[in-house]
Swiss-Prot record:
ATP binds at K336. A motif ('HIGH' region) lies at residues 10-20. It comes from Sulfurisphaera tokodaii (strain DSM 16993 / JCM 10545 / NBRC 100140 / 7). Is required not only for elongation of protein synthesis but also for the initiation of all mRNA translation through initiator tRNA(fMet) aminoacylation. The gene is metG. One of its GO terms (molecular function) is metal ion binding. Pfam families: Anticodon_3 (PF19303), tRNA-synt_1g (PF09334). This is Methionine--tRNA ligase. GO terms for biological process: methionyl-tRNA aminoacylation.
Length: 571
């Protein structure tokens, strides 16, 4: 089985915030790390990259009188370093839409769609002040259906209806706030309507697409899919390859979606296995996982599969599109201008990255919008990590060193009590349950199994009380600690996708190396035998004490310093 994993491509005009991170990048990384243990490292490919074309970059470059690529070069390198070096994101390939492989692939792919492309004259919003054609999302106004005053030119976030800039009441340019004019211009349209029935059938038949994804995609289908313009009058982008389309570029959403394929091709070219990419995009032995925010559902659940179908090349359609709801910050939407939220270059200076990774997965908004609060974040660290997991590990390992000189005692199966067999069963089942949830993209729900096992372990110790058993029956105390030590190995493997360094630390304390070589399907087995020597015991997690005033003061200092080092585009 081949597993393709993708996180939505971050747009390079802003540093991602914590909501962006958990919506795509971090979630995809956690799943990819799990998948490598489950299916084997050679069978998993995890890709993404910087989305760098389109109007926002073009506008910024004009303001600064520089080439757009000068801005995106800096921003791409900044984001890449943050993801790979700071946040421990395990991409096989983190690329960019300015990659020559990507640009060539997009142009070639577009020509394969020509059967479903038609040329139409359309009225496009044009800002006379900024002297630029405006993409749908660069026009805002009032929704004609529900009256929502902040609707975008492509969709209303309040009622979910599809829109065009022409439909908006009182449309405004998002760049300057002025009313745009509508100019006639010729564009190339991808006929989505040709795939209305196929998309509907695919969605309804899927056993793995989440309900929130199905709901949004089917609402598009029920309204009737309409042709969508795949060209723009922007200069900064991939030139449209169609005859007569000189001066036009490919709409960024269409080309960014194709980046999932081009990034896979690029990865295998880098490692000298140029044909291997096909194993992750064709055939029945492939599963593909996309981690995105809910605002990107239509593009991944409608437009991407329609393009793949239209190519006529039997590309694998998405297996799971794991779309998160929104993460709020202390009850409010993230806002850079209003200083609401934490951005991914600020967060590492407030808490250890490993803690952040765990916190964000525990707060992952899988079914509804979720509120990040510092009180809850610190509770997760101090109670779930320190008390539930860390304390359990310390209790078990300390007793093995104290009572058995650091050697795992032998298990005597004939002396097992009901509590022992019950906990052994819980150890075996925990990684299976977590795997079932992860396979559906339910990472927060899956992470609950880690805590259940740690809490069950603490309860097991309290019930069996090996510190008392050791006084009269060393063999029975040995049974308890053998089982408990084996549960720590299980915990370390389950914790690894979320907290790779902490999991490796626990694994090392158990006397093992290279947790990445473990196999998920063996995670619940009692493989640690008698006389196995454990290593020195050290503190796995520490409690964090912070109050809101301290956090806000520290954030102000961090932001002042970052303003000096962030790339021009990201300030």
């Amino acid at each position: 089985m081949k597993i393709f994993v993708a996180s939505a491509w971050p747009y390079v005009n802003a540093v991602p915030h914590l909501g962006n991170l958990i919506g795509s990048v971090l979630s995809a990384d956690v799943f990819a790390r799990y998948a490598r243990l489950k299916y084997g490292q050679e069978n998993v490919v995890f890709v993404s990259g910087s989305d760098e074309h389109g109007t926002p970059i073009e506008v910024e470059a004009k303001k600064r009188n520089v080439n757009p690529k000068e801005l995106t070069d800096q921003a791409h390198e900044y984001d890449k370093k943050l993801f790979l070096d700071v946040w421990e994101i395990s991409y096989n390939n983190y690329t960019r839409t300015e990659s020559e492989i990507h640009k060539t692939f997009v142009r070639d792919f577009m020509l394969k769609l020509e059967k479903y492309i038609k040329i139409e004259e359309d009225e496009i919003p044009y800002c006379e002040y900024d002297k630029i054609y405006l993409p749908d999302r660069f026009v805002k106004g009032t929704c004609p259906y529900c009256g929502f005053e902040d609707a975008r030119g492509d969709q209303c976030d309040n009622c979910g209806r599809l829109l065009t800039p022409r439909l908006l009441v009182n449309p405004k340019c998002v760049l300057c706030g002025r009313t745009p004019v509508f100019k006639k211009t010729k564009h190339w349209f991808f006929d989505l309507s040709a795939f209305n029935d196929k998309i509907e059938e695919w969605i309804k038949n899927s056993q793995t697409l989440p309900e929130n994804v199905k709901s949004v995609a089917l609402s598009w289908v029920k309204e009737g899919l309409k042709p969508r313009s795949i060209t723009r009058d922007n200069a900064w982008g991939i030139p449209a390859p169609f005859e007569g389309a000189e001066g036009k570029t490919i709409y960024v959403w269409f080309e960014a979606l194709l980046g999932y394929i081009s990034a896979t091709i690029e990865y295998f070219k880098k490692i000298g296995k140029e044909e291997e990419w096909k194993k992750f995009w064709f055939g029945n032995d492939v599963k593909s996982y996309y981690f995105i925010g809910k605002d990107n559902i239509p593009f991944h659940a409608v437009i991407l599969p329609a393009m793949l179908m239209a190519s006529g090349e039997n590309y694998v359609l998405p297996t799971v599109i794991a779309a998160t709801e929104y993460l709020l910050y202390e009850g409010q939407k993230f806002s850079k201008s209003r200083k609401i939220g934490v951005w991914i270059d600020e967060a590492p200076q407030l808490l250890d990255i490993e803690y952040w990774r765990f916190i964000l997965i525990r707060l992952r908004p899988e079914e509804r919008d979720t509120n990040f609060t510092w009180r809850e974040a610190l509770r997760i660290v101090n109670t779930e990590l320190n008390d539930d997991i860390g304390n359990y590990a310390n209790r078990v390992l300390s007793m093995v060193r104290r009572y058995f000189n650091g050697e795992v005692p032998q298990i005597k199966y004939e002396k097992l009590k009901d509590e022992d067999t019950k906990f052994i069963s819980e150890i075996k089942e925990a990684p299976k349950k977590m795997s079932e949830l992860f396979e559906l993209g339910k990472l927060k729900a899956g992470s609950e199994e880690i805590l259940k096992l740690a809490r069950n372990g603490n309860s097991y110790l309290n019930i069996r009380a090996p510190w008392n058993l050791i006084k009269n029956d060393k063999e029975e105390a040995g049974n308890v600690l053998n089982i408990a030590v084996n549960s720590l190995r299980t915990l370390s493997i389950m914790l690894y996708p979320l907290m790779p360094k902490s999991a490796e630390k626990l694994y090392n304390m158990l006397g093992f190396k290279d947790i990445e070589r473990e196999k998920w399907d063996l995670a619940g087995e009692l493989v640690i035998k008698s006389n196995h020597k454990i290593n020195e015991v050290s503190v796995l997690f520490k409690k964090v004490e912070l109050n809101e005033n301290d956090i806000n003061k520290k954030l102000d200092e961090i932001r002042k310093n970052l303003e000096k080092i962030r790339p021009t585009l990201l300030r």
